[in-house]
Amino acid sequence: MATWMLAGHILMGSAQLAAYVYRLIRPHKIGIFGPSLAGKTTLDQYLTVPGDIDPIPVEMRTTHPVKNGSFQIPHATKKQVRWKGEKTPIMTADIGGQSQYWNLWAEDMIDRNTSVVFFVVDDRVAWSQPAMQEAVAGFKYLTDIIVNHRFPSTFSRSMKKKAKKYKPKVVCLVLNKMDLWWTNESQQMWDMGLRRQHPMVTPFQEDMRRLRKSAVATNVEATAAQYGLNVEGAVIRTINMI
């Protein structure tokens, strides 16, 4: 009996090692998008090296150089998310949130064939009408690409071909900066499984339903990327929905 148990443990350990090596070679491809100043760069920095992140000044927000009349997309980089004793390799890129960069969201998402999309918003969607409208418009833009294949007209023939076949496995709405908006009511809603009914989620519900009807799973997570609050858990729980 002991021999069989030992053999079982060895096989399980070998399977876990094989899965980890596979992910080292082929990490989860994740897209991180959302409006400007919502915390995407902070999230990318935290995933690169965990720890408290210095606030990023407005004048230092992410921008992209222009070449031949087009904004240049940055290269995605490998990272490892450590959670509950396990390491999960991922690849992400830091892309600006201004509307002139939305085509880069589409390019990154489709060209890398990302299986998970994180759309990051912050507390401004709760108290600023312009910020909420901008965030909803950005989320709708991505949803239209995924559901209706409304890709940018600037796409090359090969990219258009990829776009017609592209569909992520999961789209997660990340409510960032929870250190600014989280309340006892928020905690109660999370505890009761009602996070999708939170007022910050309400403006995005219609497009989340559109994604679900197109066989794309959706998730809602709360984080404070600047302080690393719930970041690893949010990423891994979403990946596990694949």
Where is each model-derived feature located?
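Short coil/turn segments at secondary-structure boundaries
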Residues: D44-Q45, L104-E107, A131-Q133, E185-Q188, ...
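Switch I (effector-binding) loop of TRAFAC-class P-loop GTPase G-domains
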Residues: T48-P89, W102
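Glycine-rich phosphate-binding P-loop
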Residues: K29-D52
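Conserved GTPase G-domain signal focused on the G5
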Residues: G39-K40, W181, E221-I242
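Short, flexible boundary segments at extreme N-termini or domain junctions of P-loop NTPases and their
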Residues: M1-P35, T154-F155
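Extended hydrophobic secondary-structure segments that form protein cores and membrane-embedded regions
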Residues: G31-I32, T92-D94, V170-K177, V220-A225, ...
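Short acidic, Gly/Ser-rich segments with clustered Asp/Glu that frequently serve as metal-coordination loops
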Residues: I95-W102
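Conserved C-terminal guanine-recognition region of P-loop GTPase G domains, centered on the G4
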Residues: D111, V116-R212, V216
